[in-house]
């Protein structure tokens, strides 16, 4: 099914998702290995996890309404971010343009009402050197972030990273 035909992402319980992942999104379905997570995910349309995963669906619409092109672009962006693992091993994933848009907007349920979400294209323009500075700021010290004041990753993106986006 084409991404444009999917209204909201749905969660599915499965055995194959590694325990280190909350969800793995494939073609509009968020796979997880926790039945309670599925229940919570599917309960309301405006919970942040569902909004986050639905943003990925809208991103696929923005890439010629193709899952294949979306996943190829996603893989390419992950590979491009590999230098970030010198700071923290999962930074290559967390600071990808698609993830930055999804984390930034996951608390705005109205964001998924758009036909497509393409702010990731602006995040993509941020140089790796600049992203690496933000990775260091986020993972400052030994912790897993946030670096100050119990800031969420969404708040961190809005406060620091979005200032590098074109007007």
Residue ranges of predicted features:
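Short, solvent-exposed loop/turn segments at secondary-structure junctions
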Residues: 31, 37, 55, 64-65, ...
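Residue-identity detector for glycine
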Residues: 28, 60, 141-145
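Short pre-active-site segment immediately N-terminal to the catalytic Zn-binding motif
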Residues: 23-50
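Metalloprotease/metallohydrolase-associated module, dominated by Zn2+-dependent proteases
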Residues: 2-21, 68-167
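Catalytic Zn2+-binding segment of zinc metalloproteases
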Residues: 54-72
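Intrinsic disorder/low-complexity signature
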Residues: 10, 44-46, 53, 96
